[in-house]
From Swiss-Prot:
Species name: Dictyostelium discoideum
InterPro entries in the cross-refs: GATA_TF, Znf_GATA, Znf_NHR/GATA
PROSITE patterns found in the cross-reference section: GATA_ZN_FINGER_1 (PS00344), GATA_ZN_FINGER_2 (PS50114)
GO molecular function, one term: transcription cis-regulatory region binding
Residue spans of biased composition, Low complexity class: 167-179, 410-482
UniProt name for this protein: GATA zinc finger domain-containing protein 6
């Protein structure tokens, strides 16, 4: 019988009216759910013959009897009795009937339904779920026999097998009593009959006896069939129990039932259908139950109150994967993500995970700080390398410039007199003019002034910068500035490669007859004393010098070219040309200045080539 079919015969308002009804209704729900689950399992694999149908038969019969008992208690009328006494229904409406109604209304099943009706009146199903777990048989008062003790468990067929004899005796006694009552009524109604009717009464008595015998035979046959069915079922159950049961992973929900307080015992029983300590078997009928008795105050009979143990919510096993515990107050998640750990192991695992997370965060922070430090160090190293490379490049540029300046054919810087004695060793790219005496300056100045005033244009101002001192001179070279007056002893720029020398400078030793190498390159000269002759023939180098009466005579200067000590015009045409030796550099950035300088050089060449070759006494020449 299905659950939806039971709702048709049980009024919904009657469930909450009596606690007994609630108990029966909960049991109907439980058994109907188990019947549906087991039947669906069997239908999913019809080819397999290892399924036991005894559990389905047992629970469906229990549902049937509980509904019968429920309706009789509520409405004082059995619905089974109503089906048996109803007139037959047309076969056209069989399609609209349910399967249960078709079975009940089938005439071939009428005798079986009658036996079930008598069986439901004899046994009280509601007494099965009490603490003693044995049915109470309704027997007449004259019977003093007690039912034998039930077998272990709540097996319904064990209850049937233990009470079949009592049911048989009760049914026979009820039939005899009914027959006796009817017989007495018939005798009282026929008391005034004549003697002719005595023969008919004897015949009637014989017929009644035959009817009773037939009824007894029928009942005996029905009981024998029930005994055979019970034996077959018990044999199958024993075979299943003897074989090794295979554990299943399905877990059933625990159900709690409450029995109303009775004067003898006011207790509530809680049944748990999934005791984790005992493995479940494939047969649903052999599911174990554990009963825990708790008083109305909520205090258990044990020494201490324990929280209810939750079953494992995973399907692979029913134990803790760490410690093997099968019961715990709460199942916790393990490393696999499933709730496979008990409460204690789960707490320990959570603490370990939290510590590992904290360590991972610390390691991440440390690694980030290390990367930041490494990046900052690398940036500093790169900056230092760039600075070093820049310094090296600057040094290389300075060295290249110095090498270029060293190879240029420029005049050697000599010391010159100035206001401060500290600037005597500084070198100048353009030599200072040599100082002439007051006697010879007038003739040379007049000659140069006449040349420069007629041929050379005015020279723009130039700026020379020294590295040792920050003095800046910007003389303007013109024809007026080249005035060699005898009154003023200021030096005059004769040539960029000619410098004036002092009397303290080293001269050629006129007393010795040796030709040693002279200091300084290129050769410069200084004429201190000479006659007022306007023409000097020629000068000779130190290689051609000869000693004559303590005086130096120079000759063969006609081939001497002073322009070889001046930079070439191609070199002078550059916009920024460094002229000088050492730290002193002069920048020539104007073409007009270069033109003026070349004019001075040509004038000096004409001057010296026009001088007479004979040099008077008192002339000292330093080469």
């Amino acid at each position: 019988m299905e659950f939806q079919e039971a709702l048709k015969y049980i009024p919904s308002n009657s469930i909450c009216s009596n606690p007994n009804y609630k108990l029966i209704w909960k049991k109907i729900q439980q058994y109907s759910y188990e019947v549906n689950s087991s039947s669906s399992l069997i239908l999913s694999d019809i080819s397999s013959s290892s399924y036991d149908l005894s559990g389905i038969f047992e629970k469906s019969l229990m549902i049937f009897l509980m509904i019968e008992n429920f309706t009789t208690q509520y409405s004082n009328q059995s619905y089974l009795y109503r089906f048996l006494n109803e007139p037959p229904i047309n076969n056209n409406n069989n399609n609209t009937k349910s399967e249960f109604q078709q079975i009940i209304t089938d005439p071939s099943n009428k005798e079986s339904l009658k036996s079930l009706l008598q069986f439901s009146k004899t046994i009280n199903i509601s007494k099965i779920f009490e603490n003693n777990t044995q049915p109470i048989i309704i027997s007449p008062p004259q019977q003093s026999q007690q039912p034998p003790p039930p077998t272990s468990g709540n097996n319904f067929f064990s209850i049937l097998s233990s009470n079949i004899n009592t049911i048989n005796n009760n049914s026979n006694n009820n039939n005899n009593n009914n027959n006796c009552k009817s017989y007495k009524k018939q005798q009282t109604s026929k008391g005034s009959a004549t003697a002719s009717t005595n023969t008919t009464t004897d015949i009637y008595d014989e017929q009644q006896m035959k009817l009773q015998q037939l009824q007894q035979q029928y009942y005996q046959q029905q009981l024998n069939e029930l005994q055979q069915i019970n034996q077959q079922i018990s044999q199958k159950v024993n075979l299943l129990q003897q074989t090794t049961p295979t554990t299943t992973n399905t877990s059933t929900t625990a159900t709690t039932t409450t029995i109303p307080p009775s004067p003898s015992n006011t207790t509530t029983t809680t049944t748990n259908n999934n005791n984790n300590n005992i493995p479940q078997q494939t047969s649903i009928s052999t599911a174990s139950t554990s009963i825990k008795i708790i008083s109305e105050d909520g205090v258990s009979n044990n020494k201490r109150k324990r929280r209810p143990r939750a079953p494992a919510p995973f399907l692979d096993s029913l134990y803790c994967h760490s410690c093997g515990e099968t019961q715990t107050s709460q199942w916790r998640r393990g490393p696999d993500g499933c709730k496979s750990l008990c409460n204690a192991c789960g707490i320990r695992f959570a603490n370990i995970v939290s510590k590992e997370k904290a360590l991972a965060v610390k390691e991440k922070n440390i690694s980030i700080n290390m990367l930041l430090n490494e990046s900052s160090n690398q940036q500093q190293q790169q900056q230092q390398q760039q600075q070093q490379q820049q310094i090296i490049q600057q040094q290389q540029i300075i060295q290249q410039q110095q090498q270029k300046d060293d190879h240029l054919p420029l005049s050697r810087p000599s010391s010159f007199s100035s206001q401060s004695n500290s600037q005597q060793d500084d070198s100048l790219p353009l030599s200072r003019p040599s100082s002439f005496s007051s006697q010879s300056s007038s003739s040379s100045s007049s000659f140069l002034s006449s040349l420069l005033s007629s041929s050379s244009p005015p020279i723009p101002s130039t700026t020379t910068t020294t590295t040792t001192t920050t003095t800046t001179t910007s003389p303007t070279i013109s024809s007026e500035s080249l005035n060699f007056s005898s009154a003023t002893n200021t030096p005059t720029n004769l040539s960029p490669n000619l410098q004036s020398i002092n009397h303290n400078d080293k001269l050629i030793n006129n007393n010795n007859n040796n030709n040693t190498a002279l200091e300084g390159f290129p050769p410069t000269f200084n004429i201190n004393n000479y006659n007022n002759n306007n023409n000097i023939d020629k000068l000779s180098s130190s290689k051609d010098s000869t000693e004559n009466n303590g005086y130096n005579y120079y000759s063969s200067y006609n081939n001497y070219n002073i322009s070889e000590y001046v930079p070439s015009p191609a070199y002078q045409n550059s916009r920024m040309t460094n002229v000088g030796i050492g730290s002193f550099k002069r920048k020539l950035s104007n073409e007009d200045q270069l033109n003026g300088l070349s004019a001075i050089v040509t004038a000096s060449e004409q001057l010296f080539f026009g001088i007479s070759n004979d040099v008077n006494q008192g002339s000292n020449v330093k080469l």
